[in-house]
């Protein structure tokens, strides 16, 4: 999330939008009238890179969790186009040990050269991300940074998920000609195997992965003022939830999508769930940071049975508080903060969490969640 927020803010110097109202946003959740059929299974074509010509950021992110060894992280490629004139690509990698081996924690962000999108695949010098022809596995290989040499294979364990018809929320007063968009699609539970090399260290990775592809077709601080995100993995279940809240320009509209799975099937896909920030405390940035969090899930199964669940945990371990504007020139930062009230921070947490589902499931696992604050 860091790079696309940075690029958007830098390009527009923080200008604020007028108040268009609720009628100028068209959430994908508004199109879903039958909650037992709120998603469809993804196809190879769904994962094709869109590459719009206007301002946008497209990402593919693979969140991996190795429950036995304690290693967790993500590999991400970011393809961005600023105002239709400047296209860049970046490979970011986060590696973290939630069992306390702080010396193994690392973060790399590397600019890509000679990059190209080919259907659902992505290539650059020293990097390949490929979806197999059977739509069952992704392979990520990267040697673009010696501190994070990655060779991972993800195999789908449950069907891929896209909400509604195309997973896209549109912005604009004319739905046929929107001026912005937000799109997400998922592989909520996959196996992962491979290695991560950092210097002379080699880490064997074997566990579970959640894969998400996203497209944000507008300036980031115009699209959302806050985000909540969860990737929870246990030995038998996965839980994924993505929520964003628009600025006042789009009536503080909240869009929430969520997925619960067992090890081999989708239990429920749901919309309009509630994320509860518990015991928030205002830190030195001025944002109310939660000390615990609950992600609620309230939906229907494919056979129309009610499925209610939650993932809860204390937010003891903060992996990083990311100051999105840290690398932006001070004069742009001053304008952005003063004009639009933008002061974006991403709080990345990794903690033991517990999943409960109303059929009697109660299981501990590992949760990686983000709480992002962009503007008031």
Swiss-Prot record:
It holds the Pfam family Svf1_C. It is a peripheral membrane protein. One of its GO terms (biological process) is ER to Golgi ceramide transport. GO terms for molecular function: ceramide binding. GO terms for cellular component: cis-Golgi network membrane; cytoplasm; endoplasmic reticulum membrane; nucleus. Signal peptide: none annotated. Residues 1-18 are annotated as: Peripherally associates with membranes. Keywords: Cytoplasm, Endoplasmic reticulum, Golgi apparatus, Lipid transport, Membrane, Nucleus, Transport. It is found in: Golgi apparatus, cis-Golgi network membrane; Endoplasmic reticulum membrane; Cytoplasm; Nucleus. Ceramide-binding protein that may transfer ceramides from the endoplasmic reticulum membrane to the cis-Golgi network membrane, and is thereby required for the biosynthesis of complex sphingolipids. Belongs to the SVF1 family. This is Ceramide-binding protein SVF1. It comes from Debaryomyces hansenii (strain ATCC 36239 / CBS 767 / BCRC 21394 / JCM 1990 / NBRC 0083 / IGC 2968). The lineage of its organism: Eukaryota, Fungi, Dikarya, Ascomycota, Saccharomycotina. The gene is SVF1.
């Amino acid at each position: 999330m860091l790079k696309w927020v940075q690029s958007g803010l830098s390009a527009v110097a923080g200008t604020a939008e007028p108040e268009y109202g609720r009628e100028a946003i068209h959430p994908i959740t508004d199109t879903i009238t039958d909650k037992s059929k709120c998603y469809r299974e993804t196809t190879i074509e769904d994962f094709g890179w869109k590459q719009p010509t206007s301002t946008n950021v497209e990402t593919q992110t693979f969140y991996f969790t190795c429950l036995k060894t304690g290693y967790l992280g993500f590999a991400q490629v970011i393809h961005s186009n600023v105002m239709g004139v400047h296209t860049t690509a970046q490979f970011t990698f986060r590696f973290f040990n939630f069992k306390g081996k702080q010396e193994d924690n690392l973060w790399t962000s590397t600019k890509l050269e000679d990059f190209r999108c080919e259907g659902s695949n992505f290539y650059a010098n020293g990097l390949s991300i490929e979806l197999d022809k059977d739509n069952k596995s992704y392979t990520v290989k990267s040697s673009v940074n010696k501190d994070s040499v990655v060779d991972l294979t993800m195999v789908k364990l449950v069907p891929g998920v896209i909400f509604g018809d195309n997973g896209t929320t549109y912005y604009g007063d004319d739905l046929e000609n929107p001026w912005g968009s937000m799109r997400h699609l998922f592989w909520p539970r996959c196996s992962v195997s491979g290695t991560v090399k950092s210097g002379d260290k080699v880490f064997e990775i074997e566990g579970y992965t959640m894969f998400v592809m996203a497209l944000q077709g507008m300036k980031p601080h115009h699209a959302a003022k806050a985000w909540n995100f969860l990737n929870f993995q246990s030995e038998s279940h996965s839980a994924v939830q993505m929520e964003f809240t628009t600025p006042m320009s789009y009536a503080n509209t909240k869009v929430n999508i969520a997925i619960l799975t067992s090890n081999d099937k989708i239990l429920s896909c749901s919309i309009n769930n509630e994320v509860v920030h518990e015991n928030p405390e205002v830190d030195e940035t001025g944002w109310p940071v939660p000390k615990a969090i609950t992600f609620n899930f309230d939906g229907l199964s494919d056979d129309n049975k009610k499925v209610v669940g939650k993932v809860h945990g204390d937010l003891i371990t903060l992996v990083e508080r990311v100051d999105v504007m840290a690398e932006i020139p001070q004069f742009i930062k001053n304008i952005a903060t003063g004009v639009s009230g933008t002061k974006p921070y991403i709080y990345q947490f990794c903690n033991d969490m517990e999943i409960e589902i109303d059929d009697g499931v109660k299981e501990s696992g590992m949760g990686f969640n983000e709480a992002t604050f962009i503007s008031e």
